[in-house]
Amino acid sequence: MILVNVHAGNCDNTLRNFKKKLQRELYFRKMKEQRYYETPSAKRVRKAQEAARRQRKFARKKMFDE
């Protein structure tokens, strides 16, 4: 459960903080993934692709840092 404090009726900052907390908790990603049923084999393929993408990103970052 996500709690957000409202200070002096400041709704704009409260809404911004609420959205940040939702993103940190990966709430939007979970909603998107659960919108449709994903077969276990498709889930494995997707996770492997995500891992490969992270590896490439890390390799690029490491190459530019050196």
Curated annotation (Swiss-Prot):
GO annotation (BP), single: translation
Ribosomal protein as UniProt keyword: yes
Domain of life: Bacteria
Keyword terms, alphabetized: Ribonucleoprotein, Ribosomal protein
Cellular compartments per GO CC: ribonucleoprotein complex; ribosome
Keyword presence, Transferase: no
InterPro entries: Ribosomal_bS21 (IPR001911), Ribosomal_bS21_sf (IPR038380)
GO MF entry, a single one: structural constituent of ribosome
Entry-linked Pfam families: Ribosomal_S21 (PF01165)
Family classification: Belongs to the bacterial ribosomal protein bS21 family.
Protein name: Small ribosomal subunit protein bS21
Species: Rickettsia akari (strain Hartford)
